């Protein structure tokens, strides 16, 4: 059976539980000077059976899923850039950790779930940005795209204009 065949009976959905609101530009030269996005984006993964729409928890193993963050302006995303252009934008705008592995945690209702936390993600330029979070399933040596979600736009300020952490 091909690696992708097992996923044809599943629905993958990412939801953003904590949207980024603002950030201070990052010089990306000193650890203390990183303008971390605030609040840290937190995502939750839901996997359901295609037939029954029931949650599938055995698939929520930490070593199976990864989410990659792509930072760009809303205008950049509307243009549907090629992967090469997106990579160039990452070098221009992003710093910090761009990927997050799945963490099995409990939500605010004490229910176990699959979460991705971006506690060290920063932006190097001022302006309005969005983050595209892309979910991949690791199947052997392959990364299989499963879902994606976009953050709300957020503003990145210069250090002088930054209103502070929320």
Please state what every model-predicted region is.
Residues 1-130, 136-166:
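Structured recognition/catalytic domains enriched at protein termini
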């Amino acid at each position: 059976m091909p690696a992708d065949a097992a996923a044809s009976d599943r629905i993958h959905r990412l939801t953003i539980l904590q949207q980024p609101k603002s950030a201070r530009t990052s010089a990306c030269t000193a650890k203390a000077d990183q303008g971390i996005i605030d609040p840290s984006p937190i995502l939750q993964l839901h996997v359901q059976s295609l037939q029954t729409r029931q949650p599938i928890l055995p698939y929520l193993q930490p070593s199976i899923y990864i989410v990659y963050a792509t930072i760009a302006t809303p205008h950049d995303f509307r243009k549907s850039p090629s992967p090469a252009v997106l990579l160039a934008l990452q070098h221009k705008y992003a710093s910090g950790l761009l990927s997050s592995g799945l963490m099995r945690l409990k939500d605010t209702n004490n229910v176990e779930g699959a979460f991705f936390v971006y506690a060290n993600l920063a932006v190097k330029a001022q302006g309005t940005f969005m983050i595209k979070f892309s979910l991949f399933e690791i199947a052997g040596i392959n990364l299989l795209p499963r879902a994606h979600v976009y953050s709300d736009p957020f503003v990145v300020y210069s250090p002088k204009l930054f209103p502070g952490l929320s």
